[in-house]
C-alpha cells in the first residue's frame, strides 16, 4: 500500500501458547531398583505436577513433553536414591507412604552449582537455598543419606567447601523446582512394586 497515513498491523500477537492449569501426570516406565538389603524390585511409579509459573516454564522447558522428560529424570533419580536407602520389606509395607513423601519432597528441589547459589538473592544465606550434605563411604554415617548441615558445617561451607573438616561429605546446593523450571511436583506414587521375573 503506497498511500500516505499511519497503518497498524493486527493482530499484535503472532501466536499464543496455552498451558494446562490442571495437574499433569507423568508415568515412568517400570525400573528395576536395588534396595538397601541388595534385593531387586521392579517399581512402576507415576508423578503429578502442576505449572506454577507459566513464563518461567516456557523459558526453561517450552512444552509438556520436555517437562515430562525432566520430571521423569528428577523423580527417577530421587526414587533410585531413596530405594537404595530402604529395605525391600519397607518399600512393600505401609512405610511406602513415608518413602513417597520423601521422594516428592526431594524431587521438588533442583540442584544448582555453588556459583549459582552464591548469585541468588542473599547468596548462601538465601531463604530459597537448601544446602545438603551427603556422606561418602568410610564415614560413620550412611553413605548416600542426605542431611542438613549443622551450624558449624554451614560456617565451614561458606568459608571453604573444600576444607578438611568436610572431606567425608559431598556438599550440594538446591533451589526450589518452582524457581528453576516453574513447576511443582504435587504427588509421587508407586503403582506397583514387584519382584523381578525369574
Label each residue range with its predicted role:
Residues 63-65:
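Flexible, surface-exposed loop regions and adjacent strand-edge segments
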Residues 1-9, 47, 179, 198:
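Short intrinsically disordered, low-complexity coil segments enriched in acidic
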Residues 19-36, 57-61, 170-172:
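N-terminal post-signal-peptidase region of extra-cytosolic proteins
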Residues 35-38, 42-43, 48-49, 67-196:
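Amphipathic, coiled-coil-like alpha-helical scaffolding segments used for oligomerization/assembly
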Amino acid at each position: 500500500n503506497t498511500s500516505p497515513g499511519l497503518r497498524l498491523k493486527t493482530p499484535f500477537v503472532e501466536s499464543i501458547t496455552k498451558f494446562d492449569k490442571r495437574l499433569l501426570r507423568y508415568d515412568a516406565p517400570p525400573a528395576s531398583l536395588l534396595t538397601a538389603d541388595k534385593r531387586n524390585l521392579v517399581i512402576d511409579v507415576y508423578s503429578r505436577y502442576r505449572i506454577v509459573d507459566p513464563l518461567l516454564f516456557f523459558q526453561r522447558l517450552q512444552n509438556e513433553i520436555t517437562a515430562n522428560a525432566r520430571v521423569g529424570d528428577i523423580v527417577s533419580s530421587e526414587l533410585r536414591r531413596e530405594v537404595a536407602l530402604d529395605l525391600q520389606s519397607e518399600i512393600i509395607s505401609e512405610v511406602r507412604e513415608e518413602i513417597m513423601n520423601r521422594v516428592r519432597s526431594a524431587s521438588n528441589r533442583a540442584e544448582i552449582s555453588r556459583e549459582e547459589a552464591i548469585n541468588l538473592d542473599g547468596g548462601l544465606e538465601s531463604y530459597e537455598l537448601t544446602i545438603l550434605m551427603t556422606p561418602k563411604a568410610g564415614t560413620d554415617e550412611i553413605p548416600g543419606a542426605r542431611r542438613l548441615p549443622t551450624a558449624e558445617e554451614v560456617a565451614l561451607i561458606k568459608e571453604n567447601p573444600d576444607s578438611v573438616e568436610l572431606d567425608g561429605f559431598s556438599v550440594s546446593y538446591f533451589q526450589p523446582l518452582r524457581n528453576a523450571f516453574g513447576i511443582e511436583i504435587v504427588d509421587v506414587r508407586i503403582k506397583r512394586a514387584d519382584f523381578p521375573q525369574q
